[in-house]
Amino acid sequence: MKTTADLLKIGDVALVTHFDIDKIPFKLLEMGCLPGNEIRVLQIAPFGDPIYFDVNNGSHLAIRKETARDIEVEILNNKVD
């Protein structure tokens, strides 16, 4: 299912499919937040911002919800409740 990274829930694993290079900070690219890479939601701060991700089972990134909204993803599996 395609969506954006800001709509993922804790435990969701998704594949980054697309983003606008002009809207994504270069530091995220350096840390592996690239199309084709997996991201997993580790934690979401109170009020939903920022969102803490694991990228490719290694880099941990806290991304503002506004930035996560610009990252298109395809959910690979959802958290099991």
Features from the language model and the residues they span:
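A structural micro-motif recognizing beta-strand termini
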Residues: 18-22, 56
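Short alpha-helix capping/helix-loop boundary micro-motifs
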Residues: 1-2, 23-27
